């Protein structure tokens, strides 16, 4: 290393970081070859030197080379721990720029620029000494380097830096260095750093590199690093005119610095600069549009920051970042005080570097190129501590899908997120204020953003429009249409077919299911299945070995076997009563031992032995009825009650007929109980047919309705005849033109008072007026109560 160069060496754990993942890096002796497509983060150079030779800047105050292509901050890169004799306390952050210069104490560069595709070389100043090569692709910003003393070869070198801006028209990379007020000594062998006293403030360096176009960086050890840009995209127009681009940067100013802003114009130039350095391929060089660099410094005062109440800031904008294709004159006016720039075109610029420079929020921001940007920083406030690698924060999904945000810079230099109104341009500090303000634009809220080009469909959601367009595509393809199995209607996608089938299902809720073997009909498919098993199925796999009777379930066979064995496992705790059925035991206890159970329920008058049982029983009455009938508004507290309701109300046919009285029943068990009631009673035989009945009144009615042809009672209007006077009275009500009994809960109406009463009790009455004398269970009809007694209380009173 000669005395004209300053050697900066970093040793990292054998890695060269390529942010895009599309580049390739390899070592060839002392040569580093880097292939870049869009963006490269230079970090962790392995056993190599980064050198700038013979670079002589003329004006150290402000020389800027701005990237004309890149406006995207890609990703965060944090320097790892430097494995050397000492740790560096200066902070280096590499999101989009490269820090490649050290300045003596007497000279403070505000901006330093190296033009496009030109190796920063020919540095003759003795104060900046770098060994061999430094890649300065696209641009270098050296800002806010104050009170920094660099010792090269163990000696302090103080000299003036003369900047000589090079003219070129390709800027391939951008480097921003934001140093702080700290004092460091860099040795040639390592990088030992001595931190100044406590009077120095904490600071952070931000190092950012980004590329838009693919390129190759080659280092041959002698001629310096070169940048071969292979992209052939020409941003200029065919007539040779190039648009002008405005970029705005904000950096921290030194205490007491008065110059807080300015502009630098960078014009087009030839492929060869004035120092005679030729580009790698002049024929393939990109013509770069004119661009204007607007920079602004902000004083960093901790005292002002403590006194500032950010919540009090409403709509006043000190510096606003404009994202999108707005007029460039508005952008320049927001960045530079009252400076007007005409006929400029603003490119999209995401101000993530500003937010990183003035805040701790390192959340990723997504730009329109689809790449994510985040910022890792190394804090040097810990003195000589190692460069700790911070974990990046998890990316937060934006809270709002419909509201855009903008970042403004407050008087303290911190970024503030505001919510601009897209109609009038007013800015608000919260989304709630913006929503409240949007009520002043009702005509805009009524408009929908997205409209289908094939029909009049409009929506505010992009995904809804996408699904709608897909339906058009599927409709045009008749061979891919989906057909409904029930009605044959075609649909474009499965979602529409599913919705259509739900309509069939709702209609099928009132459909009656008929038995194909008999006239049985019910509204429930489950009841029809049970009917088929009970009546028409001959499969009884569980056979009793004693009597040969078959059962469908093993539990039924187990209960039946107790008849043959005489087993009575259920024993009364108050007497010697035993039963083979648990329900019979409960009935026995409640009826025979009511004195031992003094606690009664106030609602159903059931008795219990202690208060806990009464309280537990009371929950049954308080329980909400959650079992809803699918065919009407009836609700039951349990499934068994609901099933009884469906059988009694919504099952029309009575397939199980009594042979003696021709009475029909829903279930075979009901018919069996009914036949048992005929036993022991005198049967009355019809003399005209085989009809038998125990009730003589029913027999007489049978004879009148079936075997009597005389109809003495005739209607005067329609001449219809009736056998009884009561039948004629009922018939005459039909000619009145009105329905006498109209249900107030539904549309049911009838002229029969008894039929109307049965309807109200069975459908709309939640009370059970007919109660069992043994267990106090309620029923709507007397027939239901009698069936209950025959089933559950047949052994009552037996020892």
Curated annotation (Swiss-Prot):
Keyword annotations from UniProtKB, A to Z: Activator, DNA-binding, Metal-binding, Nucleus, Phosphoprotein, Repeat, Transcription, Transcription regulation, Zinc, Zinc-finger
Keyword field contains Chloroplast: no
SUPFAM superfamilies: beta-beta-alpha zinc fingers
Protein's recorded name: Zinc finger X-chromosomal protein
Sequence similarity: Belongs to the krueppel C2H2-type zinc-finger protein family. ZFX/ZFY subfamily.
Zn-finger (C2H2-type) residues: 419-444, 450-472, 482-504, 513-536, 542-564, 570-593, 599-621, 627-650, 656-678, 684-707, 713-735, 741-764, 770-792
GO MF, one annotated term: DNA binding
Cellular compartment(s): Nucleus
GO cellular component, as recorded: nucleolus; nucleoplasm
Gene that this polypeptide is encoded by: Zfx
Function: Probable transcriptional activator.
Residues with PTM Phosphoserine: 269
Broad class of the protein's primary localization: nucleus
UniProt cross-references to Pfam families, sorted A to Z: zf-C2H2, Zfx_Zfy_act
GO biological process, one term: ovarian follicle development
Organism: Mus musculus (Mouse)
SMART domains: ZnF_C2H2 (SM00355)
């Amino acid at each position: 290393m000669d005395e004209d160069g300053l050697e900066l060496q970093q040793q990292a754990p054998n890695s060269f970081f390529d942010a895009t993942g599309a580049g390739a890096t390899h070592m060839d002796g002392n040569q580093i070859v880097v292939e870049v497509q869009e963006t490269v983060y230079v970090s962790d150079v392995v056993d190599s030197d980064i050198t700038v030779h013979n670079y002589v800047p003329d004006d150290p105050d402000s020389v800027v080379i701005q990237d004309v292509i890149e406006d995207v901050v890609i990703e965060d890169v944090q320097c790892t721990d430097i494995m050397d004799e000492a740790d560096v306390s200066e902070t280096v952050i590499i999101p989009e720029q490269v820090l490649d210069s050290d300045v003596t104490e007497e000279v403070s560069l505000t901006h330093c620029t190296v033009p496009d595709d030109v190796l920063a070389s020919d540095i003759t100043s003795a104060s900046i000494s770098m060994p061999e090569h430094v890649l300065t692709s696209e641009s270098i910003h050296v800002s806010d380097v104050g009170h920094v003393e660099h010792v090269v070869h163990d000696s302090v070198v103080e000299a003036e830096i003369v900047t000589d801006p090079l003219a070129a028209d390709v800027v391939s990379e951008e480097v921003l260095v934001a140093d702080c007020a700290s004092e460091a000594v860099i040795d040639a062998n390592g990088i030992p750093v001595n931190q100044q006293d406590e009077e120095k403030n904490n600071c952070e360096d931000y190092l950012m590199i980004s590329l838009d176009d693919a390129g190759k960086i080659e280092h041959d050890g002698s001629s310096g690093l070169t940048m071969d840009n292979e992209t052939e995209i020409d941003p200029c127009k065919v007539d040779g005119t190039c648009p002008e681009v405005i970029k705005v940067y904000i950096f921290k100013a030194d205490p007491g610095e008065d110059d807080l802003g300015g502009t630098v114009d960078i014009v087009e130039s030839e492929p060869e600069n004035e120092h005679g350095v030729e580009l790698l391929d002049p024929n393939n060089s990109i013509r770069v549009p004119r661009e204007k660099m607007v920079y602004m410094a902000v004083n960093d005062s901790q005292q002002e920051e403590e006194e500032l109440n950010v919540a009090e800031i409403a709509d006043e904008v000190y510096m606003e970042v404009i994202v999108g294709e707005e007029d460039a004159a508005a952008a320049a006016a927001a960045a530079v005080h009252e400076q007007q720039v005409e006929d400029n075109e603003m490119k999209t610029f995401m101000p993530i570097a500003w937010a990183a420079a003035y805040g701790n929020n390192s959340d990723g921001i997504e730009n329109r190129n689809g790449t994510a940007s985040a910022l890792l920083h190394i804090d040097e406030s810990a003195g000589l501590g190692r460069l700790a690698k911070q974990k990046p924060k998890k990316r937060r999904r934006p809270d709002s899908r419909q509201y855009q945000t903008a970042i403004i810079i407050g008087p303290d230099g911190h970024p503030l997120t505001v919510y601009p109104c897209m109609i009038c341009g007013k800015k608000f500090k919260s989304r709630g204020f913006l929503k409240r303000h949007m009520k002043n634009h009702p005509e805009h809220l009524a408009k929908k953003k997205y409209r289908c080009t094939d029909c009049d469909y409009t929506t505010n959601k992009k995904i809804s429009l996408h699904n709608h367009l897909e339906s058009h595509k599927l409709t045009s393809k008749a061979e891919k249409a989906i057909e409904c199995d029930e009605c044959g209607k075609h649909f474009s996608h499965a979602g529409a077919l599913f919705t259509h089938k739900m309509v069939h299902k709702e209609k099928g809720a009132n459909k009656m299911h008929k038995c194909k073997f008999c006239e049985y009909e019910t509204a429930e498919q489950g009841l029809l299945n049970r009917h088929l098993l009970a009546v028409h199925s001959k499969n009884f796999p569980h056979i009793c070995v004693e009597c040969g009777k078959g059962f469908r379930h093993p539990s039924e066979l187990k209960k039946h076997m107790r008849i043959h064995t005489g087993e009575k496992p259920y024993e009364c705790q108050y007497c010697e009563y035993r039963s083979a059925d648990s329900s019979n035991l409960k009935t026995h206890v409640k009826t025979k031992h009511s004195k031992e159970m003094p606690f009664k329920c106030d609602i159903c008058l059931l008795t219990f032995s202690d208060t806990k049982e009464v309280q537990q029983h009371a929950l049954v009455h308080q329980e909400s009825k959650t079992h809803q009938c699918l065919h009407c508004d009836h609700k039951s507290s349990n499934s068994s009650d609901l099933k009884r309701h469906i059988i009694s109300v919504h099952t029309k046919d009575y397939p199980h007929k009594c042979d003696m009285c021709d009475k029909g029943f829903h279930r075979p068990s009901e018919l069996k109980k009914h036949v048992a009631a005929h036993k022991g009673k005198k049967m009355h035989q019809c003399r005209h047919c085989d009809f038998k009945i125990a009730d003589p009144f029913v027999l007489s009615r049978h004879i009148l309705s079936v075997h009597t042809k005389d109809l003495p009672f005739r209607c005067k209007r329609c001449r219809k005849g009736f056998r009884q006077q009561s039948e004629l009275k009922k018939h005459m009500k039909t000619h009145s033109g009105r329905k006498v009994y109209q249900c107030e809960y539904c549309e049911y109406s009838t002229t029969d008072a008894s039929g109307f009463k049965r309807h109200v009790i069975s459908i709309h009455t939640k009370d059970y007026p007919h109660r069992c004398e043994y267990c106090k269970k309620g029923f709507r009809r007397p027939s239901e109560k009698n069936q209950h007694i025959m089933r559950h209380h047949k052994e009552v009173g037996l020892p």
